[in-house]
Amino acid sequence: MSKLKGKVAVVTGASKGIGAGIAKALAAQGASVVVNYATSKSGADAVVDAIAKAGGTAIAVGGDVSKAADAEHIIDAAIKNYGRLDILVNNSGVYEFSPIEAVTEEQFHRTFNINVLGVILTTQAAVKHLGEGGSIINIGSGASLMTPPNSTVYTATKGALDAITGVLARELGPRKIRVNSINPGMVETEGTHTGGFIGSDFEKALVAQTPLGRIGQVTDIAPVAVFLASDDSHWLTGEHLLASGGLR
């Protein structure tokens, strides 16, 4: 299949987890992919290798999306190596759950810098090159709708991302650039394992409330990104697709 043949995509935070899955899925549909990483070059290289072994095309590019110069560098890598940009997936994100009494200024600024400022800076760099038919996909969270306890800062960033998605859909619509978000529920990734969520009472509570009876997998989210990146979704913009197995 080649829904994205000839297209060029940038996926931020793609060295593992949801970002890695999306990068692989876009490449499998024919896109050339810039696999961005902040610190894990080895992880990004592994994603690039997996794409190459499957017959796809990708490069790994380092950069901190919360820094304007780095955001420009990431986008410029797509132009330098592939000559164009069609798809931007703003996936980079951090999370730390804590009760309100434990929230710190450092936690607030770090989370907002990556989850919100990073999206703005990378999008700012990308729109210089995106043309008619371009697609921006923001990876939000079901947390913005479900507002779980002990997630004040993280959920605030994802609420901001929902708002940014709506604003940019209106702002960029006249240029025929679409902007949508995917809002996953809990997904099994390296991060949710490291954070102690997998196997926890929190996971069990979520599963009990989920109509489809399990937490998500990366392979549940990546096809949604392919849909939003492709012409199959040409009449969708400003949408927030809740990919959570029915949990809301």
Which role fits each region the language model picked out?
Residues V8, S15-G17:
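Conserved glycine-rich cofactor-binding loop
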Residues D45, P174, G185-T210, D220:
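A glycine/serine/threonine-rich, flexible loop-to-helix segment
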Residues P99-I100, T104-H109, L206:
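Substrate-binding pocket helix/loop in short-chain dehydrogenase/reductase
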Residues T123, T157:
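Active-site helix of classical SDR
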Residues K128, R170-P174, H234:
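Alpha-helical segment proximal to the catalytic Tyr-Lys
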Residues S141:
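Residue(s) in the substrate-gating loop at a strand-loop-helix junction
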Residues S181, D201-D232, L236, A243-G245:
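C-terminal helical subdomain
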